[in-house]
Every structure is written in C-alpha cells, then in structure tokens.
Amino acid sequence: MSERLSGHTLLISLIATPIRHSLSPKMHNEAFAKLGLDYAYLAFEVGNEELADAVQGIRALGIRGSNVSMPNKQAIIPYLDEISPAAELVGAVNTVVNKDGKGHLVGHVTDGTGAVRALAEEGVDIKDQIITLSGAGGAGTAIAVQLGLDGAKEVRIFNQKDAAFANAEKTVEKINSRTQTKASLTDLADQEAFKKSIAESSIYIDATGVGMKPLEDMSLITDPEVIRPDLVVFDVVYSPAETKLLKFAKEHGAKKAINGLGMMLYQGAEAFKLFTGEDMPVDYIKDLLFNDQDK
C-alpha cells in the first residue's frame, strides 16, 4: 500500500471501539489497490466520549468518508449535517460521506441491506418469514427495518431495557406504519417469551455483539431445545468467525449457522460505492476475507 500513497491520497476512516478485530481496513485497502484508486483506509479507536472531536477531525482534515461502528452509530447523528432517508428511518448511521471533502457530512446506513444480502447468498429468503431478532442498537435496528422493507412476515425484536429500548419502540412503530411487516418489541429478560418466539421463527438473528471480545464466552441461547433442524441462526459478529452461539447451533443441528462476515462484506461494498463512486470487486475481496477466516 505504501507505493500508492502520495500527496493526493484521499483518506477514509473507521471510528469505533473495540477496533483491532476489524477487517474493514483490509477489505477497503485491498479493493483500492485492486482498482488502482488513490485512497487509504485507517481505523481509529473512538468511543462516544471522543466522538465530537473525531467528527470535527473528519471536517478539518478533509477525510473523504468514514465507516461508523459500535458504539457510535446512533450517537453520531447530531454531529452530521444531513442523513439519508434510510438512515432517518433506521435512526442510525454506519457510513459518513464528506461531500467533495468540504466538510458537509452526510450519514448513510448499509447494515440492513448487507445483512439481507448475506442471508440471500446463503440461500435464506426472508420474505414471508417470522424472524426473531435480539439487539436494538444500530446494526439491529438497520436489520429490523430492512427485514420490514423486504417483506418479512413478522420481526420480533428482543432487547434489554436500556437506552436502546426506547428507540426500538419507535422502530417498531415505523415498521408497522410504513411496511406490511408486523413488528413487536419484548424485554430480553423475559426468557420464556424469547424461547417461544424462536420456536415459532424460521430465522434467529443475534445483533447484540455478544460473542465478540470481551464477551466471547457468552451466548444468549444456552438451551439445546431452542435449536431445531429447520432454524437458521445468524450472528452479526464475524470475529471470532465462530461465536459460542454459532458453535452451539451447529452442535445441536441448526439448519444453518451463519456468521457476520458476509454482512460485513456486502455493507462494505455499498459503503465503498458511496466513498468512491466505484463498485467494489466483491468476488476478489470475498476470496481474501473468507480464506483468511478459514486459516
């Protein structure tokens, strides 16, 4: 990559914490190199406390765009000049574009489309399905909304009663009023309702981040009876490649156990297009990422 850097190189960033596990820098930098684009992608350890300064830095330094991950996807919105209609519906942002590098920051969301495409690539069609989703943060909200837009029969959201719960109530209202999908929200502490919902669902999606460091020894599902041969289990975490949830699902005979690598790839491809105006070489990047994960 050093051979590509020059005084004209445009910088793209990632602001999140924790950050060291992220494959986004590799994905984007390899794509830039493959296409001969004079861009570089760097990750910065940024939480909510540093977020305002980080956004000001994007403006001041002329950084052309940034991906945004936990815990900043909702917190960043007040610092932006504009958000896309999809981001407004979701109430979260995972991609920021600095229009012409002049400091006008526009927020977008690509998580939901990335997740649905990742499922489709695994042969899983969400249309007319009952889906249980745990987690109502930025990623979970984006997925829930996209499931509604793409025709799921029901989306049953479970989340602990934290700051995200009130936002999830608004998300449920939006899905019910703007799509044909029936959405509901339940406290994750109600384990009987949680298990019953999964028993009635064909797809279970965990968007909580449980299973990623430092919670790699945890899983929201610990009862083998919850796992069925016709149940698809999808965890948005991709590092580790096999979370405790996915290992448990495989051991107890789930139809499919899918990690978040595909979601990361496809949401990244959409962000890449927003940053550069070019199509990411998805097949090339997919081979690189999946081969690395298999080592």
Curated annotation (Swiss-Prot):
Enzyme kind, highest EC tier: oxidoreductase
Binding residues for shikimate: 22-24, 69, 94, 111, 238
A single GO molecular function term of this UniProt record: shikimate 3-dehydrogenase (NADP+) activity
GO biological process entries: amino acid biosynthetic process; aromatic amino acid family biosynthetic process; chorismate biosynthetic process; shikimate metabolic process
Pathway linked to the protein: Metabolic intermediate biosynthesis; chorismate biosynthesis; chorismate from D-erythrose 4-phosphate and phosphoenolpyruvate: step 4/7
Pfam families attached to this UniProt entry: SDH_C, Shikimate_dh_N
Lineage: Bacteria, Bacillati, Bacillota, Bacilli, Lactobacillales
Protein name as catalogued: Shikimate dehydrogenase (NADP(+))
Function comment: Involved in the biosynthesis of the chorismate, which leads to the biosynthesis of aromatic amino acids. Catalyzes the reversible NADPH linked reduction of 3-dehydroshikimate (DHSA) to yield shikimate (SA).
Family annotation (Gene3D superfamilies): Leucine Dehydrogenase, chain A, domain 1, NAD(P)-binding Rossmann-like Domain
Organism: Streptococcus uberis (strain ATCC BAA-854 / 0140J)
Nucleotide-binding listed as a keyword: no
Quaternary context: Homodimer.
Gene it is expressed from: aroE
Family: Belongs to the shikimate dehydrogenase family.
